[in-house]
Amino acid sequence: MATRTQAREAVIGMLYAYDLGNESIIEIARSMLEEKKIKNKQQDFAFSLLQGVIEHLSQIDLCIAPYLKEWEFSRLGGMERAMLRLGAFEILYTETDTPVIINEAVELGKMYGGEDNAPRFINGVLDALSKAHTKNKKSEDCSKTQDIINDALGKES
């Protein structure tokens, strides 16, 4: 039986493919998960993560952007983008404990991050996002979280 870590690992691979232009990934996701021996509850979990990230992609990117410091989102490695998007989705839209989410993202960063400092970078971005989001836990979108972010950065909404 697959673990949630393996499910997340499969999801970042599919998000990477989606980011490269394979927009039909959602249609073949279940068969890809089957091939990776991710079945039943873990398959449902993985599929819901993939579907959720894709559905909320623009909001997720908007929420991540302020924490990239000098980096532009488009200049990040594809796998780093996928890991940040998955982690941000889970922080913003699920009930999973934040330390679990961040730890999973960091561990995936150690395996798949293109840079040696990818795990540290992922940890910093997701931790900062989670702290801002905690101030507005029930936000359906990132608008209130974005207001908090802008306030912290001294920007106008």
From Swiss-Prot:
Annotated keywords: RNA-binding, Transcription, Transcription antitermination, Transcription regulation
Q: Does the keyword RNA-binding apply?
A: yes
Q: Does the keyword Transmembrane apply?
A: no
Source domain of life: Bacteria
Q: Quick one: a GO biological-process term for this protein? A: DNA-templated transcription termination
GO cellular component terms listed in the entry, alphabetical order: cytosol
Q: Which GO terms describe its molecular function?
A: RNA binding
Q: What does this protein do?
A: Involved in transcription antitermination. Required for transcription of ribosomal RNA (rRNA) genes. Binds specifically to the boxA antiterminator sequence of the ribosomal RNA (rrn) operons.
Question: What family does the database annotate?
Answer: Belongs to the NusB family.
| Protein name in the entry | Transcription antitermination protein NusB
Species in which this protein is naturally found: Helicobacter hepaticus (strain ATCC 51449 / 3B1)
